[in-house]
Amino acid sequence: MFYGEYQHSVDAKGRVIIPSKFREGLGEKFILTKGLDNCLFAYSLEEWSNLEAKLRSLPFTDKDVRAFVRFFFAGAAEVEVDKQGRILIPQNLREYAGLEKDVYIIGVSTRVEVWDKSKWESYSGDENMSAESIAEKMAMLGI
């Protein structure tokens, strides 16, 4: 399980340090793909395989399912952690998420997310993230 948030910087070559707590769960190689809300999602190879199986079971005849599967898989890349604990974020994924310099790397249960610093600060400060709003949504979900 992944949790917590860490600030790091993307270097001139597009590399970023992955926090050691996250590296342990993700492994030396993992999948990085386009996420929702204009961030990136990172999955361990095992979790990616589980997600792939779930997506494969969805009805291929549904246009929205096909669009979602394309979005998720077309942007995916296998990345490898170097000896300094960094990964190279592919250019297309950096552009998608607007990653230029400062980033937040956050743990979200079964995945890790990589956010542009200003986007994360805006999103996490948004009313959708207020304690009251979250409590209401949790109650609606029976949590």
Swiss-Prot record:
- Taking the first listed entry, what is the main subcellular location of this protein, grouped into a coarse class? cytoplasm
One function term, GO molecular function aspect: DNA-binding transcription factor activity
Question: Could you tell me which residue ranges the SpoVT-AbrB domain spans?
Answer: 5-47, 76-119
- UniProtKB keywords: Cytoplasm, DNA-binding, Repeat, Transcription, Transcription regulation
Pfam families the record matches: MraZ (PF02381)
Q: Name one GO biological process term.
A: negative regulation of DNA-templated transcription initiation
Q: Where in the cell is it found?
A: Cytoplasm, Nucleoid
Which GO CC annotations does the UniProt entry carry?
A: cytoplasm; nucleoid
Gene3D superfamilies xrefs: Transcriptional regulator MraZ domain
| Domain of life where this protein originates | Bacteria
Describe its assembly.
Forms oligomers.
Family label: Belongs to the MraZ family.
**What is this protein's name?**
Transcriptional regulator MraZ
Classification of source organism: Bacteria, Bacillati, Bacillota, Clostridia, Eubacteriales
